Protein backbone atom coordinates (compact mmCIF):
# COMPACT_ATOMS: atom_id res chain seq x y z
CA UNK A 1 0.00 0.00 0.00
CA UNK A 2 1.25 3.46 -0.91
CA UNK A 3 0.65 6.01 1.79
CA UNK A 4 -0.57 9.56 1.41
CA UNK A 5 2.10 12.27 1.33
CA UNK A 6 3.30 13.02 4.86
CA UNK A 7 6.56 12.88 6.79
CA UNK A 8 7.60 9.58 8.35
CA UNK A 9 7.90 9.90 12.12
CA UNK A 10 6.82 8.50 15.46
CA UNK A 11 6.20 4.98 16.78
CA UNK A 12 3.13 4.47 14.56
CA UNK A 13 4.66 5.41 11.20
CA UNK A 14 3.17 3.27 8.44
CA UNK A 15 -0.13 2.65 10.22
CA UNK A 16 -3.37 3.69 8.50
CA UNK A 17 -6.20 4.74 10.81
CA UNK A 18 -9.62 5.94 9.64
CA UNK A 19 -12.23 7.49 11.91
CA UNK A 20 -15.82 8.60 11.53
CA UNK A 21 -17.20 10.78 14.30
CA UNK A 22 -17.83 14.36 15.31
CA UNK A 23 -16.94 16.65 18.20
CA UNK A 24 -14.47 15.18 20.73
CA UNK A 25 -14.53 11.54 21.88
CA UNK A 26 -13.92 9.55 18.69
CA UNK A 27 -11.79 12.21 17.02
CA UNK A 28 -9.57 12.44 20.12
CA UNK A 29 -8.57 8.83 19.51
CA UNK A 30 -7.71 9.74 15.93
CA UNK A 31 -5.74 12.75 17.10
CA UNK A 32 -3.52 10.61 19.32
CA UNK A 33 -2.74 8.25 16.45
CA UNK A 34 -1.95 11.17 14.16
CA UNK A 35 0.42 12.81 16.61
CA UNK A 36 2.28 9.53 17.09
CA UNK A 37 2.96 9.17 13.36
CA UNK A 38 0.03 7.21 11.93
CA UNK A 39 -1.63 8.25 8.70
CA UNK A 40 -5.09 9.25 9.94
CA UNK A 41 -8.07 9.86 7.65
CA UNK A 42 -10.97 11.87 9.05
CA UNK A 43 -14.33 11.09 7.40
CA UNK A 44 -16.85 13.95 7.32
CA UNK A 45 -20.39 14.24 6.03
CA UNK A 46 -20.62 15.60 2.49
CA UNK A 47 -23.35 18.15 3.15
CA UNK A 48 -22.41 19.22 6.69
CA UNK A 49 -18.92 19.48 8.08
CA UNK A 50 -18.02 18.29 11.57
CA UNK A 51 -19.73 20.60 14.07
CA UNK A 52 -16.39 21.07 15.81
CA UNK A 53 -15.44 23.44 12.97
CA UNK A 54 -17.68 26.17 14.42
CA UNK A 55 -15.23 26.56 17.30
CA UNK A 56 -12.65 29.28 16.53
CA UNK A 57 -9.51 27.66 18.00
CA UNK A 58 -9.96 24.19 19.50
CA UNK A 59 -10.24 22.29 16.18
CA UNK A 60 -6.84 23.62 15.13
CA UNK A 61 -5.50 21.44 17.94
CA UNK A 62 -7.88 18.50 17.73
CA UNK A 63 -7.74 18.09 13.95
CA UNK A 64 -4.06 18.79 13.26
CA UNK A 65 -2.06 16.15 11.34
CA UNK A 66 -5.22 14.71 9.74
CA UNK A 67 -6.26 13.93 6.15
CA UNK A 68 -9.83 15.10 5.43
CA UNK A 69 -12.16 12.83 3.42
CA UNK A 70 -15.71 14.00 2.70
CA UNK A 71 -17.70 10.93 1.64
CA UNK A 72 -21.21 9.51 2.03
CA UNK A 73 -20.10 6.13 3.32
CA UNK A 74 -23.61 4.65 3.60
CA UNK A 75 -24.97 5.19 0.09
CA UNK A 76 -24.30 3.49 -3.25
CA UNK A 77 -20.87 4.25 -4.75
CA UNK A 78 -19.89 6.17 -1.62
CA UNK A 79 -20.31 2.98 0.39
CA UNK A 80 -18.26 1.09 -2.18
CA UNK A 81 -15.45 3.64 -1.89
CA UNK A 82 -15.51 3.38 1.89
CA UNK A 83 -15.29 -0.41 1.80
CA UNK A 84 -12.41 -0.19 -0.66
CA UNK A 85 -10.64 2.18 1.74
CA UNK A 86 -11.13 -0.37 4.51
CA UNK A 87 -9.08 -2.87 2.49
CA UNK A 88 -5.96 -0.79 3.17
CA UNK A 89 -6.87 0.30 6.71
CA UNK A 90 -5.36 -1.09 9.92
CA UNK A 91 -7.74 0.51 12.43
CA UNK A 92 -11.23 1.93 11.91
CA UNK A 93 -12.85 3.98 14.68
CA UNK A 94 -16.48 5.05 14.57
CA UNK A 95 -18.37 7.08 17.14
CA UNK A 96 -22.17 7.01 16.89
CA UNK A 97 -25.39 6.07 18.68
CA UNK A 98 -25.22 2.38 19.57
CA UNK A 99 -24.99 -0.03 16.63
CA UNK A 100 -25.66 2.72 14.07
CA UNK A 101 -23.28 1.27 11.48
CA UNK A 102 -24.81 -2.20 11.74
CA UNK A 103 -28.31 -0.74 11.36
CA UNK A 104 -27.18 0.86 8.10
CA UNK A 105 -25.69 -2.33 6.76
CA UNK A 106 -22.02 -1.89 7.64
CA UNK A 107 -21.53 -4.70 10.14
CA UNK A 108 -18.25 -6.02 11.47
CA UNK A 109 -18.68 -9.04 9.23
CA UNK A 110 -19.07 -6.86 6.13
CA UNK A 111 -15.90 -4.97 7.04
CA UNK A 112 -13.97 -8.20 7.65
CA UNK A 113 -15.05 -9.51 4.25
CA UNK A 114 -13.04 -6.65 2.80
CA UNK A 115 -10.22 -6.80 5.36
CA UNK A 116 -10.03 -9.85 7.67
CA UNK A 117 -7.29 -8.19 9.76
CA UNK A 118 -9.16 -4.95 10.42
CA UNK A 119 -9.38 -3.62 13.97
CA UNK A 120 -12.80 -1.98 14.47
CA UNK A 121 -13.47 0.30 17.45
CA UNK A 122 -17.10 1.24 18.11
CA UNK A 123 -17.46 4.17 20.51
CA UNK A 124 -20.91 5.09 21.81
CA UNK A 125 -22.58 6.35 24.94
CA UNK A 126 -24.21 3.10 26.04
CA UNK A 127 -22.57 0.36 23.98
CA UNK A 128 -23.47 -1.79 20.99
CA UNK A 129 -26.01 -3.91 22.89
CA UNK A 130 -28.12 -3.83 26.04
CA UNK A 131 -31.68 -2.57 26.52
CA UNK A 132 -33.66 -0.65 23.92
CA UNK A 133 -34.22 2.04 26.51
CA UNK A 134 -30.57 3.05 26.44
CA UNK A 135 -28.55 1.49 23.62
CA UNK A 136 -29.61 3.85 20.84
CA UNK A 137 -29.62 7.06 22.87
CA UNK A 138 -27.32 9.96 22.00
CA UNK A 139 -24.61 10.72 24.53
CA UNK A 140 -22.15 13.47 25.25
CA UNK A 141 -19.70 14.09 28.07
CA UNK A 142 -22.24 15.02 30.74
CA UNK A 143 -24.56 12.13 29.82
CA UNK A 144 -21.78 9.58 30.30
CA UNK A 145 -20.72 11.20 33.57
CA UNK A 146 -24.27 11.25 34.92
CA UNK A 147 -25.10 7.66 33.97
CA UNK A 148 -21.82 6.21 35.25
CA UNK A 149 -21.85 7.43 38.84
CA UNK A 150 -18.93 9.73 38.10
CA UNK A 151 -20.85 13.00 38.18
CA UNK A 152 -22.59 12.33 41.50
CA UNK A 153 -19.17 12.05 43.17
CA UNK A 154 -18.00 15.45 41.94
CA UNK A 155 -18.98 18.97 42.89
CA UNK A 156 -19.50 20.19 46.44
CA UNK A 157 -21.44 18.98 49.46
CA UNK A 158 -24.43 21.05 48.35
CA UNK A 159 -24.61 19.98 44.70
CA UNK A 160 -23.11 17.44 42.29
CA UNK A 161 -21.25 18.87 39.32
CA UNK A 162 -19.79 17.45 36.09
CA UNK A 163 -16.03 17.49 35.67
CA UNK A 164 -14.98 19.80 32.85
CA UNK A 165 -13.74 20.25 30.23
CA UNK A 166 -15.46 17.22 28.65
CA UNK A 167 -13.72 14.60 30.78
CA UNK A 168 -15.77 11.63 29.56
CA UNK A 169 -14.99 12.44 25.93
CA UNK A 170 -11.24 12.48 26.51
CA UNK A 171 -11.17 9.37 28.71
CA UNK A 172 -13.30 7.51 26.15
CA UNK A 173 -11.18 8.63 23.22
CA UNK A 174 -7.99 7.58 24.95
CA UNK A 175 -9.59 4.24 25.82
CA UNK A 176 -10.35 3.74 22.13
CA UNK A 177 -6.72 4.48 21.28
CA UNK A 178 -5.25 2.04 23.78
CA UNK A 179 -7.82 -0.69 23.10
CA UNK A 180 -7.25 -0.45 19.35
CA UNK A 181 -3.49 -0.76 19.80
CA UNK A 182 -3.97 -3.77 22.09
CA UNK A 183 -6.20 -5.38 19.46
CA UNK A 184 -3.72 -4.61 16.70
CA UNK A 185 -0.97 -6.35 18.67
CA UNK A 186 -3.11 -9.50 18.81
CA UNK A 187 -4.14 -9.23 15.15
CA UNK A 188 -0.51 -9.21 14.09
CA UNK A 189 -0.04 -12.42 16.06
CA UNK A 190 -3.15 -14.24 14.83
CA UNK A 191 -4.10 -12.57 11.54
CA UNK A 192 -7.70 -12.29 12.75
CA UNK A 193 -9.43 -8.92 13.09
CA UNK A 194 -11.07 -7.59 16.24
CA UNK A 195 -14.13 -5.52 17.13
CA UNK A 196 -14.12 -3.37 20.27
CA UNK A 197 -17.28 -2.12 22.00
CA UNK A 198 -16.48 1.04 23.99
CA UNK A 199 -19.38 2.42 26.03
CA UNK A 200 -18.60 5.88 27.38
CA UNK A 201 -20.53 5.25 30.59
CA UNK A 202 -18.47 2.11 31.27
CA UNK A 203 -15.26 4.07 30.76
CA UNK A 204 -16.41 6.59 33.36
CA UNK A 205 -17.64 3.83 35.67
CA UNK A 206 -14.08 2.47 35.61
CA UNK A 207 -12.56 5.92 36.12
CA UNK A 208 -14.87 6.55 39.09
CA UNK A 209 -13.84 3.32 40.80
CA UNK A 210 -11.89 4.67 43.78
CA UNK A 211 -14.76 5.64 46.07
CA UNK A 212 -17.43 3.41 44.54
CA UNK A 213 -15.57 0.27 45.57
CA UNK A 214 -16.42 1.11 49.18
CA UNK A 215 -20.12 1.13 48.29
CA UNK A 216 -20.01 -2.08 46.24
CA UNK A 217 -18.20 -3.84 49.07
CA UNK A 218 -19.83 -2.55 52.21
CA UNK A 219 -22.45 0.02 51.32
CA UNK A 220 -20.41 3.09 52.27
CA UNK A 221 -20.89 6.03 49.93
CA UNK A 222 -18.18 8.67 50.05
CA UNK A 223 -19.39 12.25 50.60
CA UNK A 224 -18.57 14.87 48.01
CA UNK A 225 -15.70 17.20 48.74
CA UNK A 226 -16.09 20.54 50.51
CA UNK A 227 -14.44 23.60 48.97
CA UNK A 228 -12.14 21.46 46.87
CA UNK A 229 -10.82 19.33 49.71
CA UNK A 230 -10.48 15.56 49.52
CA UNK A 231 -13.67 13.96 50.86
CA UNK A 232 -11.76 11.31 52.80
CA UNK A 233 -8.38 12.63 53.89
CA UNK A 234 -7.37 15.71 55.87
CA UNK A 235 -4.51 17.73 54.45
CA UNK A 236 -5.35 16.73 50.89
CA UNK A 237 -6.93 18.94 48.24
CA UNK A 238 -7.32 22.66 47.63
CA UNK A 239 -6.20 25.23 50.21
CA UNK A 240 -5.96 29.01 50.34
CA UNK A 241 -2.70 30.78 51.17
CA UNK A 242 -2.21 34.48 51.84
CA UNK A 243 -1.87 35.24 48.12
CA UNK A 244 -3.68 32.47 46.25
CA UNK A 245 -4.44 28.77 46.11
CA UNK A 246 -2.39 25.61 46.35
CA UNK A 247 -3.15 21.92 46.26
CA UNK A 248 -1.36 19.60 48.64
CA UNK A 249 -1.24 15.95 49.68
CA UNK A 250 -0.32 15.36 53.33
CA UNK A 251 0.73 11.73 52.92
CA UNK A 252 3.53 9.90 54.72
CA UNK A 253 4.75 9.29 58.27
CA UNK A 254 7.51 11.90 58.36
CA UNK A 255 5.44 14.42 56.42
CA UNK A 256 2.60 14.27 58.94
CA UNK A 257 4.94 14.43 61.93
CA UNK A 258 6.80 17.52 60.67
CA UNK A 259 3.66 19.28 59.43
CA UNK A 260 1.96 18.75 62.80
CA UNK A 261 4.91 20.42 64.51
CA UNK A 262 4.54 23.46 62.24
CA UNK A 263 0.79 23.85 62.75
CA UNK A 264 0.84 23.23 66.50
CA UNK A 265 -0.49 19.70 66.69
CA UNK A 266 2.65 17.81 67.70
CA UNK A 267 0.94 16.76 70.93
CA UNK A 268 -1.48 14.58 68.94
CA UNK A 269 1.29 12.41 67.54
CA UNK A 270 1.40 8.99 69.18
CA UNK A 271 -2.14 9.22 70.56
CA UNK A 272 -4.61 6.37 70.03
CA UNK A 273 -6.32 8.48 67.36
CA UNK A 274 -3.08 9.29 65.51
CA UNK A 275 -0.67 6.49 66.46
CA UNK A 276 2.96 6.33 65.43
CA UNK A 277 3.32 5.32 61.79
CA UNK A 278 0.16 7.12 60.64
CA UNK A 279 0.42 7.83 56.92
CA UNK A 280 -2.97 9.45 56.26
CA UNK A 281 -5.45 11.34 58.45
CA UNK A 282 -9.04 10.29 57.72
CA UNK A 283 -11.10 13.46 58.04
CA UNK A 284 -14.26 11.57 59.07
CA UNK A 285 -13.11 8.51 61.01
CA UNK A 286 -10.38 10.34 62.91
CA UNK A 287 -11.95 12.58 65.61
CA UNK A 288 -9.14 15.08 65.09
CA UNK A 289 -9.78 15.37 61.35
CA UNK A 290 -11.70 18.68 61.63
CA UNK A 291 -9.04 20.10 63.97
CA UNK A 292 -6.27 19.22 61.52
CA UNK A 293 -8.15 21.09 58.80
CA UNK A 294 -8.75 24.09 61.05
CA UNK A 295 -5.10 24.38 62.09
CA UNK A 296 -3.81 23.80 58.57
CA UNK A 297 -6.16 26.44 57.12
CA UNK A 298 -5.01 28.95 59.74
CA UNK A 299 -1.31 28.26 59.13
CA UNK A 300 -1.60 28.45 55.34
CA UNK A 301 -3.60 31.69 55.50
CA UNK A 302 -0.64 33.45 57.13
CA UNK A 303 1.93 32.29 54.58
CA UNK A 304 2.44 33.10 50.92
CA UNK A 305 2.47 30.43 48.25
CA UNK A 306 6.23 30.83 47.85
CA UNK A 307 6.78 30.34 51.58
CA UNK A 308 4.55 27.28 51.66
CA UNK A 309 6.23 25.71 48.64
CA UNK A 310 9.66 26.28 50.17
CA UNK A 311 8.69 24.79 53.53
CA UNK A 312 6.81 21.85 52.04
CA UNK A 313 9.78 21.09 49.79
CA UNK A 314 11.90 20.80 52.96
CA UNK A 315 9.33 18.43 54.45
CA UNK A 316 8.85 16.48 51.20
CA UNK A 317 5.14 17.28 51.17
CA UNK A 318 3.71 17.29 47.66
CA UNK A 319 2.13 20.62 46.73
CA UNK A 320 1.67 22.91 43.76
CA UNK A 321 0.39 26.38 43.09
CA UNK A 322 -2.91 26.47 41.21
CA UNK A 323 -1.71 28.07 38.01
CA UNK A 324 -3.82 30.43 35.93
CA UNK A 325 -3.80 29.82 32.19
CA UNK A 326 -1.64 32.92 31.51
CA UNK A 327 0.92 31.59 33.99
CA UNK A 328 1.40 28.38 32.03
CA UNK A 329 3.39 29.92 29.20
CA UNK A 330 6.01 31.51 31.45
CA UNK A 331 6.32 28.66 33.94
CA UNK A 332 9.93 27.41 33.76
CA UNK A 333 8.90 23.74 33.63
CA UNK A 334 6.60 24.44 30.68
CA UNK A 335 9.37 26.37 28.95
CA UNK A 336 12.03 23.72 29.60
CA UNK A 337 9.85 20.92 28.20
CA UNK A 338 8.23 23.01 25.44
CA UNK A 339 4.82 21.94 26.75
CA UNK A 340 3.20 24.78 24.80
CA UNK A 341 4.14 25.10 21.15
CA UNK A 342 3.16 26.79 17.89
CA UNK A 343 2.30 25.47 14.43
CA UNK A 344 1.02 26.81 11.14
CA UNK A 345 -2.63 26.52 10.15
CA UNK A 346 -3.52 25.62 6.57
CA UNK A 347 -4.26 29.28 5.81
CA UNK A 348 -0.87 30.44 7.07
CA UNK A 349 -1.77 31.66 10.55
CA UNK A 350 0.16 30.76 13.68
CA UNK A 351 -1.69 28.68 16.26
CA UNK A 352 -0.52 28.11 19.83
CA UNK A 353 -1.47 25.22 22.07
CA UNK A 354 -0.38 22.00 23.80
CA UNK A 355 2.56 20.12 22.32
CA UNK A 356 2.67 16.41 21.50
CA UNK A 357 2.38 14.15 24.53
CA UNK A 358 3.86 11.92 25.76
CA UNK A 359 7.45 12.48 24.67
CA UNK A 360 8.96 9.48 22.86
CA UNK A 361 12.77 9.57 23.09
CA UNK A 362 13.71 7.53 20.00
CA UNK A 363 10.65 8.05 17.79
CA UNK A 364 9.12 11.39 18.76
CA UNK A 365 5.79 12.62 17.50
CA UNK A 366 5.53 15.85 15.58
CA UNK A 367 3.09 18.41 14.23
CA UNK A 368 3.39 18.45 10.47
CA UNK A 369 0.07 19.92 9.42
CA UNK A 370 -2.77 22.13 10.62
CA UNK A 371 -6.45 21.22 10.42
CA UNK A 372 -7.42 20.42 6.81
CA UNK A 373 -10.45 22.09 5.26
CA UNK A 374 -13.69 20.22 4.53
CA UNK A 375 -12.96 17.73 1.74
CA UNK A 376 -9.40 18.93 1.32
CA UNK A 377 -7.89 15.46 0.78
CA UNK A 378 -10.86 13.63 -0.74
CA UNK A 379 -9.36 13.45 -4.22
CA UNK A 380 -5.92 12.37 -2.99
CA UNK A 381 -7.37 9.63 -0.78
CA UNK A 382 -9.63 8.27 -3.51
CA UNK A 383 -6.75 8.28 -5.99
CA UNK A 384 -4.66 6.42 -3.42
CA UNK A 385 -7.16 3.53 -3.40
CA UNK A 386 -7.40 3.36 -7.18
CA UNK A 387 -10.00 5.91 -8.28
CA UNK A 388 -9.49 7.89 -11.47
CA UNK A 389 -10.27 11.58 -11.94
CA UNK A 390 -13.46 10.61 -13.76
CA UNK A 391 -14.47 8.24 -10.96
CA UNK A 392 -13.99 11.00 -8.41
CA UNK A 393 -15.94 13.55 -10.41
CA UNK A 394 -18.80 11.09 -10.78
CA UNK A 395 -18.95 10.66 -6.99
CA UNK A 396 -18.95 14.43 -6.58
CA UNK A 397 -21.67 14.94 -9.20
CA UNK A 398 -23.89 12.44 -7.40
CA UNK A 399 -23.41 14.23 -4.10
CA UNK A 400 -21.54 11.27 -2.63
CA UNK A 401 -18.22 13.05 -2.17
CA UNK A 402 -16.91 16.57 -1.73
CA UNK A 403 -13.54 17.80 -2.93
CA UNK A 404 -11.82 21.00 -1.96
CA UNK A 405 -13.20 24.04 -3.77
Swiss-Prot record:
Keywords: Cytoplasm, Transferase. Its EC number is 2.8.3.21. The keyword Transferase applies. Pathway: Amine and polyamine metabolism; carnitine metabolism. GO terms for biological process: carnitine catabolic process. CoA binds at residues 97, 104. One of its GO terms (molecular function) is L-carnitine CoA-transferase activity. It is an enzyme of class 2 (transferase). Belongs to the CoA-transferase III family. CaiB subfamily. This is L-carnitine CoA-transferase. It comes from Escherichia coli (strain K12). The gene is caiB.
